[in-house]
Amino acid sequence: MPPKAAKGKRRPNGASIEVAGVLGGGASRLKKKIRDIERLLKKDKLPADVRTENERAVKALKVELQNTQFNLKAKQVAKKYHMVRFFEKKKAVRKLKQANKNLEDISKTDVRKDIKKARKQVKHCEIDLAYVIMFPKSEKYISLYPNPKENDEVDVSNPKAKKGMQMTEQRRREFRKEIEQLIENNRLPFTIGEVLQGKTVKIEFEGQNVAADHEIDAPEPKNNQQEEDDFFE
């Protein structure tokens, strides 16, 4: 938090250290206040204590500006992709439930090979579900279930387009790996059970508390109507 000062309190040489009034007021007000303080700091004859206090204030304001810009970007990106994430979460939940049911049925057979394979599938589905929820809200969402037609439309003979596809696939694999490690180390900020119960979860990204979209974490409808598995395939 930036240092607070009493309203209207003036410093020597007319320097004002009021910053509380701009907190929460948006990026424009923060930028203006930062410029004002930086202009003040350019003055040669500025008392040492005033300079120190203003330097601290401008540092705090820059952090606040970064937070504000981060949250604004996160909201814009989340809004753009919230429907894709919503349907992908529902699909991931459905696939996990199917995998759990399959494991339960296979476990009754005592066939170790089949049980091992079923457990592996459950783990895969858990990673997918956590991926959808944990994917940073400030990034363009990379779908787990991309439409094959979209990939077919990409001109692979175009080096730029081909590189874009490769980078997208690399990011998808890298983030799935991160999620897998979080699950293995029991470091997910929620449990898979909570998600299956429809509970809302909040995720931290880079020190920011970014709440998962309500649509993504909303409880599933009570009707049991099955959606086609190829909705996003």
Swiss-Prot record:
Entry annotated with the keyword Plastid: no
Any single GO CC term annotated in Swiss-Prot or TrEMBL for this entry: nucleolus
Region entry Disordered, spans: 150-169, 210-233
Keywords: Coiled coil, Nucleus, rRNA processing
Coiled-coil stretches noted in the UniProt entry, renumbered to this chain: 53-130, 160-188
Pfam families: Efg1
Localization annotation: Nucleus, Nucleolus
Entries under InterPro entries matching the protein: Efg1, EFG1_rRNA-proc
GO BP annotations listed: maturation of SSU-rRNA from tricistronic rRNA transcript (SSU-rRNA, 5.8S rRNA, LSU-rRNA)
Family indicated by similarity: Belongs to the EFG1 family.
Role played: Involved in rRNA processing.
Protein's recorded name: rRNA-processing protein EFG1
Organism: Scheffersomyces stipitis (strain ATCC 58785 / CBS 6054 / NBRC 10063 / NRRL Y-11545) (Yeast)
